[in-house]
Amino acid sequence: RNNNAFSLDQYCISSKGQVKSVILVSKSNFRDIDTIFFDSRSKSSNLLMRVIAEKFFKINFEAKTYVPTRSMIFEPNAGYVVIGDLGLEISTSKMPGFKIYDLGEIWFNETGYPFTFASFNYVKTPSQDVINVLDSSFGRGIKSLEKILDYIKNINDINVSHKFIKEYLEKNIVYEFSKDHFSG
Protein backbone atom coordinates (compact mmCIF):
# COMPACT_ATOMS: atom_id res chain seq x y z
CA ARG A 1 0.00 0.00 0.00
CA ASN A 2 1.30 3.44 -0.97
CA ASN A 3 0.13 6.22 1.36
CA ASN A 4 1.01 8.80 -1.30
CA ALA A 5 -1.19 7.12 -3.90
CA PHE A 6 -3.97 9.11 -5.48
CA SER A 7 -7.06 7.60 -7.03
CA LEU A 8 -9.01 9.56 -9.61
CA ASP A 9 -12.31 8.25 -8.35
CA GLN A 10 -14.57 9.80 -10.98
CA TYR A 11 -13.87 7.18 -13.64
CA CYS A 12 -13.54 3.44 -13.76
CA ILE A 13 -14.28 0.37 -15.83
CA SER A 14 -16.91 -1.55 -13.89
CA SER A 15 -20.18 -3.41 -14.14
CA LYS A 16 -23.35 -3.38 -12.12
CA GLY A 17 -24.46 -6.87 -12.98
CA GLN A 18 -23.70 -8.72 -16.18
CA VAL A 19 -20.46 -7.58 -17.86
CA LYS A 20 -20.20 -10.21 -20.66
CA SER A 21 -16.45 -9.75 -21.14
CA VAL A 22 -15.27 -11.41 -17.89
CA ILE A 23 -16.56 -14.95 -17.72
CA LEU A 24 -15.86 -18.46 -16.51
CA VAL A 25 -16.41 -21.14 -19.15
CA SER A 26 -16.85 -24.77 -18.15
CA LYS A 27 -18.42 -28.04 -19.16
CA SER A 28 -19.34 -28.52 -15.48
CA ASN A 29 -21.65 -27.01 -12.93
CA PHE A 30 -19.82 -24.42 -10.84
CA ARG A 31 -19.72 -26.53 -7.68
CA ASP A 32 -18.21 -29.49 -9.60
CA ILE A 33 -15.20 -27.50 -10.82
CA ASP A 34 -11.93 -28.70 -9.26
CA THR A 35 -9.45 -26.79 -11.44
CA ILE A 36 -9.61 -23.12 -12.42
CA PHE A 37 -7.46 -21.85 -15.26
CA PHE A 38 -6.77 -18.16 -14.65
CA ASP A 39 -6.39 -15.85 -17.64
CA SER A 40 -2.77 -14.63 -17.66
CA ARG A 41 -3.88 -11.20 -18.94
CA SER A 42 -5.87 -9.98 -15.93
CA LYS A 43 -5.10 -9.62 -12.25
CA SER A 44 -8.45 -8.06 -11.22
CA SER A 45 -10.58 -10.66 -13.02
CA ASN A 46 -8.58 -13.51 -11.52
CA LEU A 47 -8.93 -12.06 -8.01
CA LEU A 48 -12.66 -11.70 -8.60
CA MET A 49 -12.83 -15.34 -9.70
CA ARG A 50 -10.91 -16.45 -6.61
CA VAL A 51 -13.29 -14.56 -4.27
CA ILE A 52 -16.34 -15.97 -6.05
CA ALA A 53 -15.03 -19.55 -5.89
CA GLU A 54 -13.73 -19.43 -2.32
CA LYS A 55 -16.17 -17.11 -0.54
CA PHE A 56 -19.45 -17.43 -2.41
CA PHE A 57 -19.41 -21.01 -3.75
CA LYS A 58 -16.94 -22.39 -1.18
CA ILE A 59 -15.20 -24.72 -3.62
CA ASN A 60 -11.67 -26.05 -3.35
CA PHE A 61 -9.76 -25.93 -6.60
CA GLU A 62 -6.35 -26.26 -8.14
CA ALA A 63 -5.23 -22.96 -9.69
CA LYS A 64 -3.45 -22.86 -13.03
CA THR A 65 -2.59 -20.01 -15.39
CA TYR A 66 -3.09 -20.08 -19.15
CA VAL A 67 -3.37 -17.87 -22.22
CA PRO A 68 -6.85 -18.24 -23.74
CA THR A 69 -7.25 -18.83 -27.48
CA ARG A 70 -10.16 -19.55 -29.78
CA SER A 71 -8.92 -23.12 -30.22
CA MET A 72 -8.39 -24.04 -26.57
CA ILE A 73 -9.34 -27.50 -25.36
CA PHE A 74 -11.55 -27.67 -22.28
CA GLU A 75 -10.78 -30.28 -19.63
CA PRO A 76 -13.63 -31.89 -17.67
CA ASN A 77 -14.36 -30.42 -14.21
CA ALA A 78 -12.31 -27.34 -15.09
CA GLY A 79 -13.31 -23.71 -15.39
CA TYR A 80 -11.54 -21.17 -17.59
CA VAL A 81 -11.49 -17.45 -16.85
CA VAL A 82 -11.76 -15.60 -20.17
CA ILE A 83 -11.70 -11.81 -20.56
CA GLY A 84 -11.92 -9.18 -23.26
CA ASP A 85 -12.81 -9.77 -26.89
CA LEU A 86 -12.71 -13.55 -26.57
CA GLY A 87 -14.97 -13.33 -23.52
CA LEU A 88 -17.44 -11.28 -25.55
CA GLU A 89 -17.30 -13.78 -28.41
CA ILE A 90 -17.96 -16.71 -26.09
CA SER A 91 -20.78 -14.80 -24.34
CA THR A 92 -22.60 -14.39 -27.66
CA SER A 93 -21.91 -17.86 -29.03
CA LYS A 94 -23.99 -20.93 -28.57
CA MET A 95 -21.53 -23.52 -27.31
CA PRO A 96 -23.46 -26.77 -26.80
CA GLY A 97 -22.46 -28.54 -23.60
CA PHE A 98 -20.80 -25.47 -22.05
CA LYS A 99 -21.85 -23.27 -19.18
CA ILE A 100 -20.92 -19.60 -19.17
CA TYR A 101 -20.77 -17.84 -15.81
CA ASP A 102 -20.63 -14.03 -15.91
CA LEU A 103 -18.37 -12.92 -13.05
CA GLY A 104 -19.77 -9.38 -12.86
CA GLU A 105 -23.28 -10.77 -12.58
CA ILE A 106 -22.31 -13.26 -9.85
CA TRP A 107 -20.56 -10.52 -7.86
CA PHE A 108 -23.57 -8.21 -8.11
CA ASN A 109 -26.04 -10.97 -7.19
CA GLU A 110 -23.96 -11.95 -4.15
CA THR A 111 -23.08 -8.43 -2.89
CA GLY A 112 -25.56 -6.00 -4.43
CA TYR A 113 -22.61 -3.84 -5.49
CA PRO A 114 -20.84 -3.10 -8.76
CA PHE A 115 -17.43 -4.62 -9.42
CA THR A 116 -14.59 -2.34 -10.50
CA PHE A 117 -12.21 -3.96 -12.98
CA ALA A 118 -10.01 -0.89 -13.46
CA SER A 119 -9.56 2.60 -12.06
CA PHE A 120 -7.16 5.50 -12.54
CA ASN A 121 -4.49 5.56 -9.83
CA TYR A 122 -1.35 7.65 -9.50
CA VAL A 123 1.70 7.49 -7.27
CA LYS A 124 1.27 11.20 -6.62
CA THR A 125 -1.57 13.64 -7.18
CA PRO A 126 -1.89 14.33 -10.92
CA SER A 127 -1.79 17.87 -12.23
CA GLN A 128 -5.01 19.66 -13.07
CA ASP A 129 -3.95 19.38 -16.74
CA VAL A 130 -3.99 15.57 -16.51
CA ILE A 131 -7.39 15.62 -14.84
CA ASN A 132 -8.70 18.02 -17.52
CA VAL A 133 -7.44 15.70 -20.29
CA LEU A 134 -9.23 12.73 -18.70
CA ASP A 135 -12.43 14.73 -18.26
CA SER A 136 -12.29 15.89 -21.88
CA SER A 137 -11.49 12.40 -23.18
CA PHE A 138 -14.36 10.89 -21.23
CA GLY A 139 -16.81 13.47 -22.57
CA ARG A 140 -15.63 13.04 -26.17
CA GLY A 141 -15.72 9.25 -25.86
CA ILE A 142 -19.30 9.17 -24.61
CA LYS A 143 -20.40 11.52 -27.42
CA SER A 144 -18.51 9.56 -30.10
CA LEU A 145 -19.74 6.06 -29.37
CA GLU A 146 -20.65 5.27 -32.99
CA LYS A 147 -17.15 6.23 -34.19
CA ILE A 148 -15.61 4.13 -31.44
CA LEU A 149 -17.79 1.17 -32.43
CA ASP A 150 -16.70 1.45 -36.07
CA TYR A 151 -13.07 1.70 -34.96
CA ILE A 152 -13.39 -1.41 -32.79
CA LYS A 153 -14.93 -3.43 -35.62
CA ASN A 154 -12.24 -2.28 -38.07
CA ILE A 155 -9.14 -2.88 -35.93
CA ASN A 156 -10.11 -5.98 -34.01
CA ASP A 157 -10.58 -9.47 -35.29
CA ILE A 158 -13.67 -9.86 -33.13
CA ASN A 159 -16.64 -12.03 -34.07
CA VAL A 160 -19.32 -10.00 -32.33
CA SER A 161 -22.09 -7.90 -33.89
CA HIS A 162 -22.09 -4.10 -33.91
CA LYS A 163 -25.35 -4.20 -31.91
CA PHE A 164 -23.81 -6.43 -29.23
CA ILE A 165 -20.72 -4.21 -28.84
CA LYS A 166 -22.91 -1.10 -28.63
CA GLU A 167 -25.05 -2.67 -25.91
CA TYR A 168 -21.91 -3.82 -24.09
CA LEU A 169 -20.37 -0.33 -24.10
CA GLU A 170 -23.63 1.46 -23.25
CA LYS A 171 -25.27 -0.92 -20.78
CA ASN A 172 -22.81 -3.45 -19.41
CA ILE A 173 -19.83 -1.21 -18.71
CA VAL A 174 -20.16 1.51 -16.06
CA TYR A 175 -17.59 4.29 -16.42
CA GLU A 176 -18.38 6.57 -13.49
CA PHE A 177 -17.52 5.79 -9.89
CA SER A 178 -20.33 5.96 -7.31
CA LYS A 179 -20.67 5.44 -3.56
CA ASP A 180 -21.63 1.84 -4.26
CA HIS A 181 -18.26 1.26 -5.95
CA PHE A 182 -16.47 2.09 -2.70
CA SER A 183 -18.71 -0.26 -0.74
CA GLY A 184 -18.32 -3.11 -3.22
Where do the protein language model's features map onto the residues?
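Conserved beta-strand segments of alpha/beta enzyme cores
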Residues: 6, 60-62, 99
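Short, glycine/charged-enriched secondary-structure capping and boundary segments
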Residues: 7, 51-52, 95-97
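Short coil/turn segments
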Residues: 12-16, 27-29, 38-45, 112, ...
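Pocket-lining segment of extracytoplasmic ligand-binding domains
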Residues: 65-151
